[in-house]
Amino acid sequence: MQYTRNTTMTKTDRDTLRSLHGRKKWEHIWAYYKLPLAIVLIIVYILGYAAYRHVTKKEDVLYLGLVNITAGSDLTEQLTTGFAEAQGLTKKQQVDLLSGLLLSESEHAEEQYVYASEMKLLGAVSAQRLDVVLMDEYARDRLLADDYFLDLRTLDASFHALSGLNAGGTVLDISDTPFVRQAGFSGRVYLGVVQNAPHPERAAAYIHYLFQR
């Protein structure tokens, strides 16, 4: 009985559709098929969006963090795109920049912002989304006390000869490197590579890049 009833309904609908013309015919088609059409459109959108994300997704080849320092547009370009070009990277590869991190309270950063920065920094390290840190003297001392950085000499034996390296080999003064010197920072700028850096070889290449003439 159920099968006969469904067949009759389908035939009735077809007969109705044949009797309609013009706009009413299209309105009937839309009323009858709008749900399946909507489902198909949603599926097409999801598949298209997934394909778009796959094609345009960037690969992060180095994670760079700025702590207690701010880079202008020119320096930011040199620290990110400039390095990517020097390395001959593809357009789908990039340096991921984590900026705006402040570990000391000032007129521009209240206690809550400093706390949020600390959590953001800790989260990036825990998730292995941080390689190189550029920082001021205060941030250097804070992060050194928390044993954030590895010995840079383990990345490249030639780093033993760097004059700006601290006694432990964990922090490098990069204030006199070409890009940083041109930026005109009021204080010294330091570099460290975190202990669990996901791209240590790229971090070593980054240090060489900063010292290039």
Report each predicted region and the residues it spans:
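Extracytoplasmic "Venus flytrap"/periplasmic binding protein-like
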Residues: 113-168
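Extracytoplasmic/periplasmic/luminal assembly and interaction segments
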Residues: 79-137
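Solvent-exposed loop/turn segments at secondary-structure junctions
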Residues: 69-73, 138-142, 197-198
